[in-house]
């Protein structure tokens, strides 16, 4: 008899939490019961899931009693407060915030890249940053085959990565611009409509933004600390899906066609690479889909053993919600739903 589990979604009414609910609804996970948790103001909200009505409860320590797996997207503060309490109550936590990503005690996992890191988990598993996830899904097969030496990444990140208020700000500014009205900027320090901002998260003393350092440090933890890497992260006026320009230098020589064949054969990746017929990954096409789309694969002629690649994925799905559910699937498959 297949063991059934009680799942909790924390931050169930947010952008990512909504995606989590939707992905769980169509998943093959053996879910016996679903607990929906959110801030106190949202407690009592009714939500339909698999044809039944569920009532959202307040996120607190006692809410995790009887829960086997909690997937959390409620922010760093809530994660730091609630995750240890959930583990004390026998619940495995998959956390989408920054709270535990760089802790050596907690695995930082992308199932297509380093699922084996789950084996020795201590009750809390961290979900990586959205921009890191799609990049490493694309880099993993190249690294396994040709050994990556260096990566230069520039991102073009959708406003939904900043939350629903940012999506609404883009919509409102676009409407105001079309009607000749003054644009109001509240979520971002500058107008985002018809603009690009080389500014995601706070700036650090080294001149990098926190988002840029997340990509660098998470790559070292997940894929290989020997890879040299630099990043520039940019917010663009797109609602959903992050795009990335990747420049990759490898130790071993390669043929471009072999890289394309490798991409086609790799889990979680869809190759869209026929530029002569205007076929390449687009943010608007990736929205609502699970794959990491790659294309524009071509040799970098400026140095030996280097290539360029364009990579696009839905930041709310593979960049957040889907990856957490895939981690849960790995835990169930490997019989790792347990706490110390």
Predicted regions: what they are:
Residues 1-192, 228, 292-293, 297-302, ...:
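N-terminal Rossmann-like NAD(P) cofactor-binding subdomain of oxidoreductases
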Residues 70, 159-340:
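Charged docking surfaces used in two-component/phosphorelay signaling
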